[in-house]
A protein has these predicted regions:
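Soluble non-cytosolic domains of exported or imported proteins
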Residues: 28-32, 85-90, 102-109, 126-130, ...
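Alpha-helical scaffold segments in carbohydrate-active enzymes
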Residues: 7, 36, 40-44, 117, ...
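Active-site recognition of the HExxH zinc-binding catalytic motif
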Residues: 93-112, 116-117
Length: 223
Protein backbone atom coordinates (compact mmCIF):
# COMPACT_ATOMS: atom_id res chain seq x y z
CA UNK A 1 0.00 0.00 0.00
CA UNK A 2 2.82 2.40 0.88
CA UNK A 3 4.52 1.70 -2.45
CA UNK A 4 1.30 2.48 -4.30
CA UNK A 5 0.94 5.72 -2.36
CA UNK A 6 4.48 6.78 -3.27
CA UNK A 7 3.73 6.12 -6.93
CA UNK A 8 0.46 8.06 -6.87
CA UNK A 9 2.08 10.96 -5.01
CA UNK A 10 4.86 11.20 -7.59
CA UNK A 11 2.43 11.00 -10.49
CA UNK A 12 0.19 13.65 -8.91
CA UNK A 13 3.16 15.99 -8.55
CA UNK A 14 4.21 15.42 -12.16
CA UNK A 15 0.72 15.88 -13.60
CA UNK A 16 0.19 19.05 -11.57
CA UNK A 17 3.47 20.46 -12.86
CA UNK A 18 2.57 19.57 -16.46
CA UNK A 19 -0.96 20.97 -16.27
CA UNK A 20 -1.51 24.41 -17.78
CA UNK A 21 -4.93 24.70 -16.16
CA UNK A 22 -5.02 27.75 -13.87
CA UNK A 23 -8.66 28.85 -13.98
CA UNK A 24 -11.79 26.71 -13.57
CA UNK A 25 -12.45 24.78 -16.77
CA UNK A 26 -15.99 25.13 -18.16
CA UNK A 27 -17.91 21.93 -17.53
CA UNK A 28 -18.88 21.74 -21.20
CA UNK A 29 -15.16 21.37 -21.96
CA UNK A 30 -14.68 18.78 -19.23
CA UNK A 31 -17.63 16.76 -20.56
CA UNK A 32 -16.27 16.79 -24.12
CA UNK A 33 -12.75 15.92 -22.99
CA UNK A 34 -14.09 13.08 -20.84
CA UNK A 35 -15.67 11.56 -23.95
CA UNK A 36 -12.28 11.89 -25.67
CA UNK A 37 -10.61 10.15 -22.74
CA UNK A 38 -13.03 7.24 -23.04
CA UNK A 39 -12.54 7.07 -26.78
CA UNK A 40 -8.79 6.78 -26.26
CA UNK A 41 -9.04 3.70 -24.03
CA UNK A 42 -11.71 1.98 -26.11
CA UNK A 43 -9.11 0.12 -28.18
CA UNK A 44 -7.66 -1.38 -25.02
CA UNK A 45 -11.08 -1.92 -23.45
CA UNK A 46 -13.63 -2.50 -26.29
CA UNK A 47 -16.48 -2.94 -23.81
CA UNK A 48 -16.38 0.83 -23.24
CA UNK A 49 -17.52 1.58 -26.79
CA UNK A 50 -21.22 1.25 -26.27
CA UNK A 51 -22.55 4.58 -25.04
CA UNK A 52 -23.78 7.78 -26.66
CA UNK A 53 -24.63 9.72 -23.52
CA UNK A 54 -22.71 12.53 -21.86
CA UNK A 55 -22.39 13.96 -18.39
CA UNK A 56 -24.31 17.06 -17.34
CA UNK A 57 -23.70 19.57 -14.55
CA UNK A 58 -26.16 19.70 -11.67
CA UNK A 59 -27.68 23.19 -11.65
CA UNK A 60 -28.06 23.19 -7.87
CA UNK A 61 -24.57 21.80 -7.28
CA UNK A 62 -23.93 23.81 -4.11
CA UNK A 63 -27.11 22.46 -2.55
CA UNK A 64 -26.12 18.98 -3.67
CA UNK A 65 -22.93 19.28 -1.62
CA UNK A 66 -25.06 19.30 1.53
CA UNK A 67 -25.97 15.70 0.71
CA UNK A 68 -22.29 14.74 0.49
CA UNK A 69 -22.85 13.49 -3.07
CA UNK A 70 -20.58 14.59 -5.93
CA UNK A 71 -22.37 12.85 -8.78
CA UNK A 72 -25.35 10.66 -9.54
CA UNK A 73 -26.45 8.42 -12.37
CA UNK A 74 -30.19 8.29 -13.01
CA UNK A 75 -30.98 5.02 -14.83
CA UNK A 76 -34.59 5.99 -15.51
CA UNK A 77 -33.53 8.94 -17.67
CA UNK A 78 -30.08 7.54 -18.56
CA UNK A 79 -28.41 10.72 -17.34
CA UNK A 80 -25.06 11.22 -15.65
CA UNK A 81 -25.05 14.27 -13.39
CA UNK A 82 -22.00 15.88 -11.78
CA UNK A 83 -21.66 18.27 -8.84
CA UNK A 84 -19.58 21.17 -10.22
CA UNK A 85 -19.38 23.22 -7.02
CA UNK A 86 -16.57 21.19 -5.48
CA UNK A 87 -12.82 21.69 -6.07
CA UNK A 88 -12.08 21.95 -9.78
CA UNK A 89 -9.56 19.11 -9.93
CA UNK A 90 -12.34 16.64 -9.05
CA UNK A 91 -14.41 17.36 -12.14
CA UNK A 92 -12.61 15.15 -14.72
CA UNK A 93 -12.61 12.08 -12.45
CA UNK A 94 -16.20 12.56 -11.30
CA UNK A 95 -17.34 13.07 -14.89
CA UNK A 96 -15.56 9.92 -16.07
CA UNK A 97 -17.05 8.04 -13.11
CA UNK A 98 -20.57 8.94 -14.20
CA UNK A 99 -19.74 8.09 -17.83
CA UNK A 100 -18.65 4.65 -16.64
CA UNK A 101 -22.18 4.19 -15.33
CA UNK A 102 -23.51 5.20 -18.75
CA UNK A 103 -21.36 2.45 -20.23
CA UNK A 104 -23.14 -0.09 -18.04
CA UNK A 105 -20.75 -0.39 -15.10
CA UNK A 106 -23.04 0.13 -12.14
CA UNK A 107 -20.77 -0.99 -9.31
CA UNK A 108 -19.12 2.01 -7.70
CA UNK A 109 -15.67 0.46 -7.36
CA UNK A 110 -15.67 -0.49 -11.04
CA UNK A 111 -16.87 2.97 -12.11
CA UNK A 112 -14.15 4.53 -9.96
CA UNK A 113 -11.46 2.32 -11.47
CA UNK A 114 -12.62 2.96 -15.04
CA UNK A 115 -12.61 6.70 -14.30
CA UNK A 116 -9.06 6.36 -13.00
CA UNK A 117 -7.92 4.53 -16.15
CA UNK A 118 -9.62 7.04 -18.45
CA UNK A 119 -8.09 9.99 -16.62
CA UNK A 120 -4.49 8.77 -16.30
CA UNK A 121 -4.33 7.73 -19.96
CA UNK A 122 -5.71 11.07 -21.16
CA UNK A 123 -3.54 13.41 -23.23
CA UNK A 124 -4.65 16.22 -20.92
CA UNK A 125 -2.49 16.69 -17.81
CA UNK A 126 -5.51 18.20 -16.04
CA UNK A 127 -7.34 14.87 -16.44
CA UNK A 128 -4.28 12.85 -15.41
CA UNK A 129 -3.93 14.98 -12.29
CA UNK A 130 -7.58 14.41 -11.41
CA UNK A 131 -7.19 10.65 -11.78
CA UNK A 132 -3.98 10.35 -9.80
CA UNK A 133 -5.16 12.72 -7.07
CA UNK A 134 -8.45 10.93 -6.50
CA UNK A 135 -6.68 7.58 -6.36
CA UNK A 136 -4.09 9.07 -4.01
CA UNK A 137 -6.80 10.22 -1.62
CA UNK A 138 -8.37 6.75 -1.50
CA UNK A 139 -4.97 5.13 -0.97
CA UNK A 140 -3.66 7.55 1.66
CA UNK A 141 -6.90 7.38 3.62
CA UNK A 142 -6.36 3.63 3.89
CA UNK A 143 -2.68 4.13 4.74
CA UNK A 144 -3.57 6.59 7.49
CA UNK A 145 -5.74 3.93 9.14
CA UNK A 146 -2.83 1.49 9.03
CA UNK A 147 0.21 3.66 9.83
CA UNK A 148 0.06 7.41 10.47
CA UNK A 149 3.86 7.77 10.27
CA UNK A 150 3.93 6.35 6.76
CA UNK A 151 1.01 8.59 5.89
CA UNK A 152 3.02 11.64 6.97
CA UNK A 153 5.92 10.47 4.81
CA UNK A 154 3.62 10.46 1.78
CA UNK A 155 2.30 13.88 2.70
CA UNK A 156 5.87 15.19 2.77
CA UNK A 157 6.37 14.00 -0.82
CA UNK A 158 3.60 16.21 -2.19
CA UNK A 159 4.42 19.52 -3.84
CA UNK A 160 3.20 22.82 -2.44
CA UNK A 161 0.79 23.12 -5.37
CA UNK A 162 -0.78 19.74 -4.62
CA UNK A 163 -1.05 20.58 -0.93
CA UNK A 164 -2.76 23.84 -1.89
CA UNK A 165 -5.42 21.95 -3.84
CA UNK A 166 -6.01 19.55 -0.96
CA UNK A 167 -6.22 22.46 1.47
CA UNK A 168 -8.75 24.24 -0.74
CA UNK A 169 -10.94 21.15 -0.80
CA UNK A 170 -10.63 20.68 2.96
CA UNK A 171 -11.78 24.26 3.56
CA UNK A 172 -14.73 23.80 1.20
CA UNK A 173 -15.99 20.65 2.89
CA UNK A 174 -15.32 22.01 6.37
CA UNK A 175 -17.64 24.93 5.66
CA UNK A 176 -20.30 22.55 4.36
CA UNK A 177 -20.01 19.97 7.14
CA UNK A 178 -20.22 22.45 10.00
CA UNK A 179 -23.67 23.66 8.96
CA UNK A 180 -26.85 22.31 10.50
CA UNK A 181 -28.23 21.81 7.01
CA UNK A 182 -25.45 19.36 6.16
CA UNK A 183 -25.76 17.44 9.41
CA UNK A 184 -29.48 17.00 8.81
CA UNK A 185 -29.53 16.40 5.06
CA UNK A 186 -26.37 14.29 4.75
CA UNK A 187 -27.56 11.68 7.24
CA UNK A 188 -30.82 11.19 5.38
CA UNK A 189 -29.10 11.36 1.99
CA UNK A 190 -26.54 8.76 2.99
CA UNK A 191 -29.30 6.33 3.94
CA UNK A 192 -31.13 6.98 0.67
CA UNK A 193 -27.95 6.56 -1.38
CA UNK A 194 -27.04 3.40 0.51
CA UNK A 195 -30.49 1.94 -0.18
CA UNK A 196 -30.30 3.02 -3.84
CA UNK A 197 -26.98 1.24 -4.31
CA UNK A 198 -28.21 -1.93 -2.64
CA UNK A 199 -31.37 -1.97 -4.76
CA UNK A 200 -29.11 -1.76 -7.82
CA UNK A 201 -27.22 -4.90 -6.82
CA UNK A 202 -24.44 -3.45 -4.66
CA UNK A 203 -24.79 -5.30 -1.39
CA UNK A 204 -22.09 -3.21 0.30
CA UNK A 205 -23.99 0.01 -0.32
CA UNK A 206 -21.91 3.17 0.09
CA UNK A 207 -18.98 1.07 1.28
CA UNK A 208 -18.50 -0.08 -2.32
CA UNK A 209 -17.00 3.30 -3.21
CA UNK A 210 -13.84 2.45 -1.28
CA UNK A 211 -13.25 -0.90 -2.94
CA UNK A 212 -11.38 0.84 -5.73
CA UNK A 213 -8.25 0.34 -3.63
CA UNK A 214 -8.19 -3.40 -4.36
CA UNK A 215 -8.31 -2.68 -8.09
CA UNK A 216 -5.64 0.02 -7.84
CA UNK A 217 -3.29 -2.35 -6.03
CA UNK A 218 -3.92 -5.13 -8.54
CA UNK A 219 -3.31 -2.79 -11.49
CA UNK A 220 -0.15 -1.32 -9.95
CA UNK A 221 1.51 -4.64 -9.18
CA UNK A 222 0.52 -6.06 -12.56
CA UNK A 223 2.73 -3.49 -14.30
Amino acid sequence: LYELCVYLAEQSNSAKEESTQTNPVPFSTVSKDAKKAFKKIQKQYPVLRYSTGRAKPVLASHLMSYTGIVGIYVPFTVEANVNTDIADYNHPFDTCHELAHLHGFMRENEANFIAYLACIQSDDAYFRYSGYMTALIYATNALYDEDTKLYMQISALLSDEVHADLHEEDIYWEKIRTTKAYQTVETASDKVNDTYLKINGQSDGVKSYGKILDLLLAEYFAR
